[in-house]
């Protein structure tokens, strides 16, 4: 398993870090079998798996349920689990209770928290031994306020992002996700920080990349962000399901090859 020291070493060696989301046992197993460096159990599962419009409806219980499944499928991969909206940013007692619960229940390697306003939470969590991955730029939990658009696109906004990146590192964050920001800004932040910086829609100059499993595989998703590249096409599964439906209705499935050869009725009738 790649630990934090190995991820930092990859950054120092300029070896790109690959990260992908996974939400269940089979997707996690696929990621591990493909030698992905990190898995994110993102609250994006609200949209990709649970059918919500945004991530804001995802609960702590949802993250625990899916986080456990991912860990079972990827027992030798660095797994990060999202802290969903409302679980942190309230009070120290409230925040740490939720973080401890999620960390222990999922057996994650780290938790992810959105926003620079959680600097104190990052510091407190680090002090009790829970590694935190910070998330800046576009923050899906705050789309009701900021919307889905490029962040850090003005001088003031860019300077603020740089300050926030340094602040979360100083607070103890073990890595940083930058989403939907100009590529030159992301490259500068990656260069300035000692911790690994993972980009999504942040250009190629970050220390690594993360994509959503369902986006990159065209799996049940109708709309895609500009930064998504489809590396496969799971939508072909629809054709397979249609074919199955046709064969059931035509009576051609199951065929003899899919049927047990054991005959039992003669034995049953002989008891009469």
From Swiss-Prot:
3-methyl-2-oxobutanoate binds at residues 43-44, 82, 112. Its main location: cytoplasm. It is found in: Cytoplasm. Its EC number is 2.1.2.11. GO terms for biological process: pantothenate biosynthetic process. It catalyses: 3-methyl-2-oxobutanoate + (6R)-5,10-methylene-5,6,7,8-tetrahydrofolate + H2O = 2-dehydropantoate + (6S)-5,6,7,8-tetrahydrofolate. InterPro entries: Pantoate_hydroxy_MeTrfase, Pyrv/PenolPyrv_kinase-like_dom, Pyrv_kinase-like_dom_sf. Homodecamer; pentamer of dimers. PANTHER family: 3-METHYL-2-OXOBUTANOATE HYDROXYMETHYLTRANSFERASE. This is 3-methyl-2-oxobutanoate hydroxymethyltransferase.
